[in-house]
Amino acid sequence: MSRIKVVCPHCGAVNAIPKKDSYTKANCGKCHRSLLETKPIDLDEVSFDNQVANSDIPVVVDFWASWCGPCKMMAPAFEESAASFALKARFAKLNTESVQSVAARFGIRSIPTVIIFKNNMEIDRISGAQSAAQLTQWVSRFI
């Protein structure tokens, strides 16, 4: 059976798990917490690099800022969409005010901007607030 690498959303440990169409249980080998967590994780520069470099599943990153009205409007939709992708994609949020180096690295000029990373590379991006349905449809193309 083939395996996929998944970064734990709780402790950041890299786990190799059997590749399946769906999962009922999958726990981190280090912290023993669930890898099925769908709540978007908050990233700093180190955790961003770890998630993007070590995940075989797509990493969907919302670049946002606390002063951004459309970012605040989209947050519930981003969380709702994330719930559909347990171990199919990892959803994460990166505050462009506190992690400016990563935002600059990817040329973030407007927010919210959502980027999908796979195999340590950007594969697509969208800018502007999106609904949960729009996000889910967009992310599904890369699963």
What positions do the PLM features span?
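Short pre-active-site segment immediately N-terminal to redox-active cysteine/selenocysteine motifs
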Residues: D56, F63-W67, S110
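Short linker/helix segments within small regulatory modules
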Residues: I17-A26
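Cys/His-rich microdomains that often coordinate metals
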Residues: N15, L35, A75
